[in-house]
Amino acid sequence: MTATEQQQDDFSNVSWSEHVHDQQTRSVPDAEEPGHDMNAPGTGLERDAPSLGNEKLECTVDTPIKENDGTKDAFVSYLITTHSTFSSFQRSTTTVRRRFTDFVFLYKQLTRDYPAAAVPPLPDKQRMEYVRGDRFGSDFTTRRANSLQRFLSRLSLHPTLRRAPILHTFLESPDWNATMRSRGSRVSSASDPGSAGVFDNFADTFINAFTKLHRPDRRFLEVKEKSDKLDDDLGHIEKVIARVARREADLEVDLRDLAEQFQKLIPLEPHVEPAVHGFSASIEDTASHLRKLKDMTDQDYLGSLRDMQAYSIALKNLLKAREQKQLDYEQLTEYLNKSTTERDTLQSGHGGGSGAGSFLRAKIEDVRGVDHEQARRERTRKLELRVEELTHEVESARKTSDMFDDEVVKEVADFERIKRIEMKAQLGSLADSHIEFYGEVASIWEKYVEEMEKQGITSA
């Protein structure tokens, strides 16, 4: 990738100050040191996000355990360890176990409570492991634990979501099930009368799918384009990394097969048994370290690329929601203008009009014996009320659209900052894994050479 392409993938290049609203955006300086822990000192977080405040919130997800084993209600729980200085926490360090459905509930609550935030998504549940029945295997649970770790890390780096009361309860409460029951009942009771609203929203979405914005905001068009480019690049990198992981797995199998074949030489060549045995053991050790590298590449780094793509989609969904707010404002404005024009026409005494609709209305009024002047005054009165109501609605829609624009600008800046910190952390971990692998392999073969030299000196 050229330097120009890399620059295009950076959302920080989007100019926020040249357009319609006078938005105040947060300054997001570059993160300095490539620390590997997303919350650790050295990530540049302290200077990178002054809006986060002084409170600390660090979460780790590990140690997946299968519970209710042997029953149809078996599930996997994950250990969450939290270090926090928030006053809402009872202790500075807490540990709880949560299952995946608990994370799903938390995610749904956050998306409901913070509609103007790009809430980080959870790993997809529609995976082949559910079909094959091996969703309790260590490979799957490790991948999921890594993804859930990234989910909580993103929340802890978000200036608004990290302060969400439901998140703090999730991270500390010993009676989380009671919280889910109470919140779930409130949400269901509140949504009962609005069941028809689901169809209304669907109808709105369907209609608006064929409606274009009259004045699209160039700022958000640029963000959408850069987000699409990011998804494209991540998709290409993911394919290459997946191929690397497969080749590392194949190489591990070949190394173990090679070690086994050398072991078969020992009965045939007993006079070189120490050398062959040591060589075979060194190959086995190399294969074991290669397995660790492959697991890190496959289970952690490859998963981080997919999770970042999902996070980018969440941002684009927020852009669609912002576009909907602007569309509502434009359509209401158009309706207001139409009603105002119709009212002014009636007030000017040209209520009859020259259209086919006006002609038919006049004929119907004649048949019914309606006084045309009285009917015109009645229509004028209704239009006055409609214009007044629409004026308030348009002003409300404008304020909502402007406020949503402001929030989306902040969300894009937060996404860019979190993305940068996470990518540096993941690349740092991948680099550390390679350094450890090559260091261990070099040590293995250096020891083998030393042993062979000792045996050569002794035999001499």
From Swiss-Prot:
| One GO MF term attached to the UniProt entry | phosphatidylinositol binding
Which top-level group of life is the source organism from?
A: Eukaryota
- One Pfam family assigned to this protein is PX
The record's section on Gene3D superfamilies has: Arfaptin homology (AH) domain/BAR domain, Phox-like domain
Question: Its topology with respect to the membrane?
Answer: Peripheral membrane protein
Q: Which residues form a coiled coil?
A: 238-266, 306-337, 374-403
Location in the cell reads: Cytoplasm; Membrane; Endosome membrane
Q: Start and end of every PX domain?
A: 56-178
Family matches, as CDD domains: BAR_Atg24p, PX_Atg24p
Q: Polar residues composition bias: which ranges?
A: 1-16
- Cite a single GO BP annotation: protein transport
**Is Membrane among this UniProt entry's keywords?**
yes
Knocked-out gene: effects: Significantly decreases the radial growth of colonies under nutrient-rich conditions. Strongly reduces conidiation. Causes only mild infection in point-inoculated spikelets of flowering wheat heads and impairs the spreading to nearby spikelets.
- Region annotated Disordered, chain positions: 1-53
- Main subcellular location: cytoplasm
Segments spanning the bilayer are none
Keywords from the named record: Autophagy, Coiled coil, Cytoplasm, Endosome, Lipid-binding, Membrane, Protein transport, Transport
Might you report a single GO cellular component term? early endosome
Write out the domain note.
Answer: The PX domain binds phosphatidylinositol 3-phosphate which is necessary for peripheral membrane localization to the perivacuolar punctate structures.
Q: What does this protein do?
A: Sorting nexin involved in the separation or division of vacuoles throughout the entire life cycle of the cells. Involved in retrieval of late-Golgi SNAREs from post-Golgi endosomes to the trans-Golgi network, for cytoplasm to vacuole transport (Cvt), and autophagy of large cargos including mitophagy, pexophagy and glycophagy. Autophagy is required for proper vegetative growth, asexual/sexual reproduction, and full virulence. Autophagy is particularly involved in the biosynthesis of deoxynivalenol (DON), an important virulence determinant.
Q: Which family does it belong to?
A: Belongs to the sorting nexin family.
Its quaternary structure? Answer: Forms a complex with ATG20 and ATG17.
Query: Know the name of this protein?
Result: Sorting nexin-4
Q: Provide the species name.
A: Gibberella zeae (strain ATCC MYA-4620 / CBS 123657 / FGSC 9075 / NRRL 31084 / PH-1)
